[in-house]
Amino acid sequence: VSAGVTVRVTASNRPLARISAKTLKVKAGSSEEVNLLADAYNPFPDSTLTVTGCTSDGASKLTVDCPANGVVSISAASDIGASTNKVIVNVRDATNTKEREVTGIISISVMDKPDAPLLSPIAGDPQDGAVNLSWTAGSSNGSPISEYKVTWSGDGSGEKSCGSVTSCQITGLKNGKTYSFKVQAKNEIGWSKESNGVEGTPDKLPDAPTDVK
């Protein structure tokens, strides 16, 4: 009588490593780092966890460097607008086996300069030495708009900060002269491109007659 024994060899019966999810904000045109392994659970505390690779769903916008030590560097291209992306990182413990490999996720928010505002045509009666402007905000691209700036040219040039509202009165202009106006938006990343241009001509309306009989 012969008997057979089946033996299954496993790398370890210890729990798998556990990697906490990370979040990261990156400005367009810049880079940020995050230590993926800083607070990870390591079933073999006498050995280090090792990053073996990573993938990103934003390959056209992000450049990701995933060294073995887990300090992941993420660079965002310039002028790409706002986006939300994920990087999936593969991590192994001291056994260095595929069956014990785990993944960590880095959620990335890319922030960019605002889109250009849309300046509305000037409407209403002419104003004495002034022009009233209004515009529609473009996308803030992940960072709140903090300021609008109007610039003008024509019979002289200038600029005016209009705060964070979407309307502004430009004063000190010469009546009967035509000016061209543009507006830009600013957030913590920088200034948007200039808006479309509109023209306006300040003028003083004639006084109403007082001796009409």
Regions found by a protein language model. Name each.
Residues L36, P117, P121, L133-T136, ...:
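An aromatic-rich alpha-helical recognition segment common to small helix-rich domains
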Residues K27-N35, N69, D125-S134, N175:
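Short coil/turn motif common to extracellular beta-sandwich-like domains
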Residues V1, A68-K86, D93, I108-V110, ...:
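Extracellular/luminal low-complexity segments enriched in Ser/Thr/Pro
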Residues V34, A40-V71, V102-M111, P121-A123, ...:
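Surface-exposed or secretory-pathway low-complexity segments enriched in glycine-proline
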Residues I74-A77, A123, W135, C162, ...:
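Hydrophobic core positions of the immunoglobulin-like beta-sandwich fold
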Residues E147-K174, E194:
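Recognizes extended acidic, P/S/T-rich segments that occur
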Residues S2-P45, N90-S120, S134, N196, ...:
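Extracellular interdomain linkers/hinges and stalk-like, low-complexity segments
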Residues G81-N96, I170-S192:
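Beta-strand-rich modules
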